[in-house]
Amino acid sequence: MKMVDELKGNLNSFLILLGIFSFLQFSFKQSFMFPSILPLNIPDSNLLLVIGNISFYFFFVFLLIVSMILSLTYKSLIPLTIILTISPFITLIPNYENSFLLYSLEIAILILGLASTIEGLIKSSLLSILLIPTLVLVNLGIYASILLNIFHNALFISYLTIYLISIAGYLAYVISWGKIKSLRNYIAISVGLLSMIPFIFFENIISHNRYLEILMNMILPSTLGITLYNPYHITLLVMALGLSTMGIVTSLIKGNVSSGVGYFLIITTVFLGIDGFSLLIYMLTPIIGFLVITSSEIESKRRLIDIISPTRNG
């Protein structure tokens, strides 16, 4: 029991480490492979790839630790944590990507993922209602992957629109979290707005440079996994990334590490489902990311589950 309490008490420390290695594996492994094949001179590219690969293993370890800690609160996460634990060994099975075992696990992740995200929502405060679009985004990404991997059909929807709606809800959640009328909140929002400036400049450069626009249309969607049905929406994607950065930075400065790290986990992996998740760890990450966000509200005095079922405790 003492060990459990210590793990829960150190959750923020594990989240910080998870966020660091998630950023490194995203920058130098997950997304680095796409610009690295272009005829560009990238200094020390081999070293960066090594950093990315090493970071990926640490990312897996800390994701597993965080998932184990959260499963103490969210019971529907327990089977998903077990799947995450065995996921590296599944790749050792010959032709595993077309095996009945993998298909069964993916369907299980879809069902349990929906249950887990709903559990995370109802066990958090009323403020978390603003995260419903993000919940939809997470589960749509998993559904799109299964639809393609198992049934060989693509889900044709405007992912960018859903992403923008998710950002709107997330920003409203971040700004409303904690004391709104406080110096820390004003500083956090100000720094968050400043973090958008590079994206605004980048959007302006792209919109006035057709060659760069074509290049970014290949790199950015490939990096995130998102599909843009209108190539001229690349500037909207850049602004969406800027708004996401603003929300994450604001959240971190306000002291809500869970919200910042959780949303980063979601946006860097959820769109990989559009073309089918290549690894189960990427399929599970958005679910865990959503629960990471809602975990900051678990101690709230007015939780949704208490309103839905007033006689229920816990």
UniProtKB/Swiss-Prot annotation:
Q: What is its main location?
A: membrane
Does the record carry Cell inner membrane as a key word? no
- Transmembrane regions listed in the UniProt entry: 47-67, 76-96, 102-122, 127-147, 155-175, 186-206, 233-253, 264-284
User: Where does this protein reside within or beyond the cell?
Assistant: Cell membrane
Signal sequence span per UniProt?
none
Q: Which UniProt keywords apply?
A: Cell membrane, Electron transport, Membrane, Transmembrane, Transmembrane helix, Transport
**What InterPro entries does UniProt report for this protein, alphabetically?**
Cyt_b558/566_suB (IPR017573)
Would you name any one GO CC term?
plasma membrane
Membrane-related topology note = Multi-pass membrane protein
Key word Endoplasmic reticulum present: no
Q: What is this protein called?
A: Cytochrome b558/566 subunit B
Gene symbol here is: cbsB
